[in-house]
């Protein structure tokens, strides 16, 4: 007897998801890796530092051991560098992981989450996987994210707002004062996920 995949058992939100399309590889473009600089993938074209490769080589020697699942030493370093308490730091396997963590932690069926059009493709995928509804916000003619408009799309079912600054792939960014003004407008119980994965590209002092 031939068995079919029980699609009706799959989470309704997951059934709405279309596969994420990552950036094309150098092989698919028929371009050597040395000639390709993938800004959208946030890749470092000059390679890892010698200090990083040296540290990795030492870690390999302990690959048979489970690492500290809490990442205590790394959190201590980040805490000292950024001046934030340890219990305010969460580690993840890249920003995708943290986005999905946040969606699962704060969203469920019947909620909605907001994000801007032309934003990072992972936002709607992470939202849908929880069963929550999408609320896509429009951008201006020059693809700028107008943060003053966010409050107009918020209702009682809104739980999370995802904002990338600078945004990938449009490259638009919001200033510190724009973000601060938006936070003052929004309800105190609304979670704002500020994605600054590409902040190294910004040179504007107002950022």
Kindly give the residue locations of the regions a language model identified:
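Active-site phosphate-binding strand-loop segment of PLP-dependent enzymes
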Residues: 141-205
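PLP-dependent aminotransferase-like
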Residues: 105-163
